[in-house]
Amino acid sequence: PLESYGIKCMSIGFLVSVDTPTIWRGPMVMKALEQMFNGVEWGQLDYLIIDLPPGTGDAQLTLAQSSKLSGSIIVSTPQDVALNDARKGINMFKRVNVPVIGLVENMSYFICDNCNEKHYIFSHEGAKKEAEKFQIPFLGSLPIDKELRIQSDEGRPACIDKPEGDIAKKYLEIA
């Protein structure tokens, strides 16, 4: 796997050019996921974090049934349509006996450069309310942040680039 800042990474995106779509059906996705999960020499790991698309598709179900997952973290934006997928994910993981460690709300708000106030354009605390309904921990919320976007585009993790910054502190609170 590729390694950056002490984190080992593997992605289907590393295997195709940037402009090439991955138009794969379930079996192809599952084969690729299985190869990345079992065929990559990860070495000694403290954690293996698997970023999956939203919902309860073949990838999530097969991974949950074929691997000993210690837990899942659901990430959602606060609007209703995204929370529908979050609910499905929570219910699926509970059904297959994978503990739901918690829920994170992404793109919770942005802070206006002009007035310095928070604006909740996608609703307010939707993921927090869902966590309460499901009686699972709400791990935290992350804002829409221009500096974070720039750091990400340039490959500079917020926690390393500005460890005392607000975004780094939010990541550490969630972790």
Task: Enumerate the predicted regions with their spans.
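Conserved phosphate/pyrophosphate-binding and hydrolysis machinery centered on Walker-type P-loop NTPases
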Residues: 26, 53, 164
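Conserved catalytic-core segment of NTP-binding enzymes
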Residues: 46-47, 53-151
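Predominant activation on well-ordered alpha-helical scaffold segments within soluble catalytic domains
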Residues: 30, 34-38, 61-64, 87-90, ...
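Nucleotide-state-sensitive switch-loop elements of NTP-binding domains
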Residues: 1-49, 69-71
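C-terminal boundary of histidine-terminating zinc-finger modules
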Residues: 154-167
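Residues on a specific face of well-ordered alpha-helices
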Residues: 27-31, 125, 132, 169
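Glycine-rich phosphate-binding loops of nucleotide-dependent enzymes
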Residues: 10, 33, 52, 65, ...
